[in-house]
Amino acid sequence: MSGPRLLLGFDYGTRQIGVAVGQAITGQARELCVLKAQNGVPDWSRVEQLVKEWRPDAMVVGLPLNMDGTPSEMSERAERFARRLHGRFGLPVHTHDERLTTFEAKGYRLAQGQRDGYRRRPVDALAAALLLEGWLAERPAG
């Protein structure tokens, strides 16, 4: 099989970064955790723990583009985060348009009956899973 088999996905944010794990063979991803961030900078030791634990072949970072497809300030920060991931871990890091994944994740939580806001159960990791599945869907499994 060519290409990555196991991937970590990141929904980048300045206060929280959602993390998901996905498999190319199934095209599915699942939520892992939400990392706290200070002005977009995560606890890199926690990211390193995840990389060591899951041993991904590659990583995917969501790009929060504007609705017209143009880059935003946040997408530029997400690209910088992607470059830092690559620099720290030496793995391929891909970016993927994540427009509306957080909106979709909130809708999913509402459909599950979550009505008490998103502090107790944030949507960031679910958004990471959705963007990772989107990236996987655009690539052949083998």
Curated annotation (Swiss-Prot):
A GO CC term assigned to this protein in UniProt: cytosol
CDD domains found in the cross-reference section: YqgF
Chief place of localization: cytoplasm
Keyword vocabulary terms for this entry: Cytoplasm, Hydrolase, Nuclease, Ribosome biogenesis
E.C. number: 3.1.-.-
Subcellular location: Cytoplasm
Recorded coiled-coil stretches: none
UniProt GO BP: rRNA 5'-end processing
InterPro entries per UniProt: RNaseH-like_sf, YqgF, YqgF/RNaseH-like_dom, YqgF/RNaseH-like_dom_sf
Molecular function GO labels: nuclease activity
Key word Nuclease present: yes
Top-tier EC class: hydrolase
Entries under SMART domains matching the protein: YqgFc (SM00732)
Its biological purpose: Could be a nuclease involved in processing of the 5'-end of pre-16S rRNA.
Family, similarity comment: Belongs to the YqgF nuclease family.
NCBIfam families for this protein: RNAse_H_YqgF
Name the record gives this protein: Putative pre-16S rRNA nuclease
Organism field: Azotobacter vinelandii (strain DJ / ATCC BAA-1303)
